Swiss-Prot record:
GO terms for biological process: arginine biosynthetic process via ornithine; L-arginine biosynthetic process. This is Acetylglutamate kinase. Pathway: Amino-acid biosynthesis; L-arginine biosynthesis; N(2)-acetyl-L-ornithine from L-glutamate: step 2/4. Its EC number is 2.7.2.8.
Length: 295
């Protein structure tokens, strides 16, 4: 339990960050264990509402893999994956859209509203927010990628104090629905908005030099270092698309991207408002970030 003096120290440490980030947009990708465990779910929701109350503009993008699998099982549809991507035939696409847009999205909206925020649920189809196209592999079905982002509906909402909650289902020019990786959607939305931060909640501590040893966490790195870690095989497996997504968003103008452990209660606040943080922060260049923050 924190003493009164500890609480004051924490608040004092947070002050420069509160001042620096007021009025800025943060895109938070919400997924993994933080969506499944009630206590973690509650802490994430409270953190998002806190950001809104202190003048930051949070935009939430969510996945929902476990919930999709639950409903596929109920409907006797066997989940299939290829190279880490869900194989999405027509029947599976119907379930994905029903679950992500109709259930998971509305649950998050309800929880934010109950916690004192004002959330509005969206999917990529709303306001032509995300234009999708096929990923180009017929064998994975209706798995898409982002062709373009129209941020007007998001901007209109955040300027009125609402918290957009976005599911990663979008349509192509013919109206065909596609399932798009939620990390990718979050990165592209962050870039299109010119967001201050992209934050990915994951089930790992961040980027580790040795994936078996949490003490090897890399707290900060720039684009060049991130690309080198991928080349050297230090970043591998499921972390590659996450790091690549962060690098792509930084290259398009996002100020910083964070990969943090969503299994830690209040991970968002710990990463944003403490000097040490708890995860990995990626920046375009270390020198430019230091100059911008100190200035």
């Amino acid at each position: 339990m924190l003493s009164d003096s500890d609480r004051v120290r924490v608040l004092s440490e947070a002050l420069p960050y509160l001042q620096a980030f007021a009025g800025r947009t943060f895109v938070v990708k919400y997924g993994g264990a933080a969506m499944k465990e009630e206590q973690l779910k509650d802490s994430v929701i409270r953190d998002i509402v806190f950001l809104s109350y202190v003048g930051i503009r949070p935009v939430v993008v969510h996945g929902g893999g476990p919930e999709i699998n639950t409903w596929l099982a109920k409907l006797n549809i066997e989940p299939q994956f290829k190279n880490g991507l869900r194989v999405t035939d027509a029947a599976t696409m119907d379930v994905v859209e029903m679950v992500l847009v109709g259930r998971v999205n509305k649950e998050i909206v309800t929880l934010i509203n109950q916690a004192g925020g004002q959330a509005v649920g969206l999917c990529g189809k709303d306001g032509n927010l995300i234009r999708a196209r096929a990923k180009g592999e017929e064998s994975i079905g209706f798995v898409g990628e982002v062709q373009g982002v129209d941020t007007r509906v998001i901007t209109a909402l955040v300027e009125k104090g609402y918290i957009p909650v976005i599911s990663s289902v979008a349509a192509d020019d013919t109206g065909q629905a596609y399932n798009i990786n939620a990390d990718t959607v979050a990165g592209e939305i962050a870039a299109a908005l010119g967001a201050e931060k992209l934050i990915l909640l994951t089930d790992t501590a961040g980027i580790l030099r040795d994936y078996r040893d949490p003490s090897t966490l890399i707290y900060r790195l720039d684009i060049a270092e991130a690309r080198q870690l991928i080349k050297d095989g230090v970043v591998s497996g499921g972390m590659i698309p996450k790091v690549t997504c962060c690098v792509r968003s930084l290259a398009q103008g996002v100020k910083a991207a964070h990969i943090i452990d969503g299994r830690v209660p209040h991970a968002l606040l710990l990463e944003i408002f403490t000097d040490s943080g708890i995860g990995s922060m990626l920046v375009g260049s270390n020198a430019a970030y230091d100059s911008a923050f100190s200035g």
